[in-house]
Amino acid sequence: MDNQHKKIKGYRDLSQEEIDMMNRVKELGSQFEKLIQDVSDHLRGQYNASLHNRDEITRIANAEPGRWLAIGKTDIQTGMMAIIRAIAQPDSF
């Protein structure tokens, strides 16, 4: 498993500092994943608590919190991958 990335075409050897930075990014990714799940759980609870309140259901539907959470999740994933790519500096597209 040592230097496993050597076997992946287009990737160079990483320094220990770069490996540590990549691990920090991965750790932050896990924290973001937990936060996104917490927000999703909150939204589900908010919706379920409002089932008998048509005005609140309409307000929630108009605000589109699920859509915005999905956009946020995708953008965070994209950002995390961009940071990883900046650290790894692969030589291919």
From Swiss-Prot:
Keywords: Nucleotide-binding. InterPro entries: Acb2/Tad1_hairpin (IPR056098). Disruption phenotype: About 1000-fold reduction in virus titer in host (strain Pa011). 3',3'-cGAMP binds at Q4, Y11, K26. Homohexamer in apo and 3',3'-cGAMP-bound form. Belongs to the Acb2 family. This is Anti-CBASS protein 2. The gene is acb2.
